[in-house]
């Protein structure tokens, strides 16, 4: 028998939905991340008595992390973290290679032109156009001193960094799921994550450079969110 975690979710800008819903159909038990996702699994024909809303798994992962101090992070990463720190990720969206390249270029230029800001870019998924995007990303960030690239940070480093982050920016589910749990604001760009439930700490933007720059600057001026003030979409 198969147990399915995080079923019922939508990501309209990626190919995940077809696989996710297929797994739902041959699973026996379902543990979803929100009430809306539970409803969707039931709409797909699953027995409501076997569908449970338990919230995102990331909450459990974060609760077991031994967070590193800022000094330890700087030592491990071999760089100085500014007060305004941004965690950034770009995954390819469904569409043409040229469109994805242009979106990434806009994203990099906006981040690179921010003043008094450190940007840590993590690697894109190696799915649709992933290798092409990673190659372009690693090449273009060389033009900007405030941007550093890390292939993989792992849970401990990533979540520890998030404690000192002013904003998570990009089109990764991390900005929609993990960032609110940590009390961190996020900017979700483009359509890759379109369809997911969002907290009030998430701001949406296109890849238009002026719009994106304006929204990042506004978020950087805000105080860090209090976890107790964040609406829990799992309820």
Regions of interest found by a model, annotated:
Residues 32, 52-54, 149-151, 203-208:
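Short acidic-hydrophobic, aromatic-tinged amphipathic segments that line or gate anion-handling sites
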Residues 9-14, 38-39, 59-60, 176-178, ...:
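Short gly/pro/ser/thr-enriched loop/turn and capping motifs at secondary-structure boundaries
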Residues 11-28:
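A conserved, positively charged/aromatic
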Residues 7-10, 35, 124-125, 191-192:
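Short, ordered loop/turn segments at secondary-structure junctions
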Residues 26-100:
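A nucleotide-sugar donor-handling region in carbohydrate enzymes
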Residues 68-164:
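Donor-nucleotide binding loops and adjacent catalytic segments primarily
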Residues 1, 5, 30, 154-198:
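A donor-sugar binding/catalytic signature common to diverse glycosyltransferases
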